[in-house]
């Protein structure tokens, strides 16, 4: 089987939506029965985004095998059935790290190590490795054409097109086609210059995706085709839409998938997008609306919580409920009090690191618990719920996490000192260990307690969810908290770690150490988020009586 590659680049400006466009195209090709995957090549020097600020970079998406990756991989998994892995995302930093390690070992036999061929060869090897076993691989190059950082990646894919053959490679370029209100027309010149930039490094785009706030007229698309040396049917208009799940249908309506299948000589049936049509229908026709407050530390950049926001929307789809998400800075809870939490139908506290804003999160968990407001805590959101319960119910005054107060009297959350690495080897770690790549990461098994709420929601005795944390519930102090009424609803597969807690005699209070948002999709949803949104709707109805 020959693997076909579609290389996706962007020009003119950043944040054009390459990831969404690539994922949408992959969804159409998958609907035609093809085995599809997507890769993201990031040009920054960090080895991975694990230690980057969420406010700068956005969310870190965790794959099943424990890779800390770009948030675009979350889009990929929400659009196609293929699960991402560490093979689907790598950075300049990772490539250089690998090449330098080989140089130190003497693998290059004394050669002068250079960008070409050593760096470009390493990039090509990883792309080919990631594409094994698939009919079509979409490879998204991060950044914008013209950036100095992305040049090695662009050179590598140029070489791949020559080596693999143009019959099995395609270049798809996204550009901005701005609308000028003064003249009442769209402008194609930025696109022409962007293509010129690509041509200067030896890449002729085969497909142009024209991003605009409105449909690009046929005459303007013809003009772009003429000046950019691209077939007119390969110039695609991608206007702004009110739902990203409409994009597969928008691309299909312009024959993009037919053009690609013909170019690759792929004989496959027409795409059936009925599942996406159902998602769009549910999204457009809710029967009610709820307001859910998300109290976090990084709310100034919503992309820091991208998967959580999408998972809440998916939970709404499963209940035919429109979810209005109110982003609340946890530090505002500290300074302004719980007044800003009133009027919400449910409260979610997501993950995070560091002490800033944590007391506001603890106050939030207490407010939800004492006022019977549905509460979902994720990662840090579980830890603050535990701290609240320890302080205010179990009489453990000033209980805290050793992450925030190392010498606190009641360290109910503490660092796990023994970890297993990606090869299953036990490693001993401490507060002085490296921050990067030293967490409990990836899919882990969790055993659910029979009479728990989560057991009903999942309808399964054992589940697998993804983790990203280095602190856990301190088992040494757990009995005192359980004696005060807190229920442990889920434990790790080896029964050593607390994974889920619930507050009995509360309508809906669930907190988990894992990240359920990473496995939620628009077509399937997720049991926790579906149950959470349903609880918010029921709470709203009770309040209205």
From Swiss-Prot:
UniProt keyword annotation of Ribonucleoprotein present: no
Binding site for UTP: 14, 187-192, 223
CDD domains assigned: CTPS_N, GATase1_CTP_Synthase
Annotated ATP binding sites: 15-20, 72, 239-241
GO molecular function, one term: ATP binding
Documented EC number(s): 6.3.4.2
Binding annotation for Mg(2+): 72, 140
InterPro entries: Class_I_gatase-like, CTP_synthase, CTP_synthase_N, GATASE, GATase1_CTP_Synthase, P-loop_NTPase
Active site location: 379 (nucleophile), 515, 517
UniProt-listed PROSITE patterns: GATASE_TYPE_1 (PS51273)
Catalyzed chemical reaction(s): UTP + L-glutamine + ATP + H2O = CTP + L-glutamate + ADP + phosphate + 2 H(+); L-glutamine + H2O = L-glutamate + NH4(+); UTP + NH4(+) + ATP = CTP + ADP + phosphate + 2 H(+)
Presence of keyword Signal: no
Summary of the function given for this chain in its UniProt record: Catalyzes the ATP-dependent amination of UTP to CTP with either L-glutamine or ammonia as the source of nitrogen. Regulates intracellular CTP levels through interactions with the four ribonucleotide triphosphates.
Note: CTPSs have evolved a hybrid strategy for distinguishing between UTP and CTP. The overlapping regions of the product feedback inhibitory and substrate sites recognize a common feature in both compounds, the triphosphate moiety. To differentiate isosteric substrate and product pyrimidine rings, an additional pocket far from the expected kinase/ligase catalytic site, specifically recognizes the cytosine and ribose portions of the product inhibitor.
NCBIfam families: PRK05380.1 (NF003792), PyrG (TIGR00337)
The protein's assembly and partners: Homotetramer.
HAMAP family in UniProt: PyrG (MF_01227)
Protein name as it appears in the record: CTP synthase
Species the sequence originates in: Escherichia coli O127:H6 (strain E2348/69 / EPEC)
Gene: pyrG
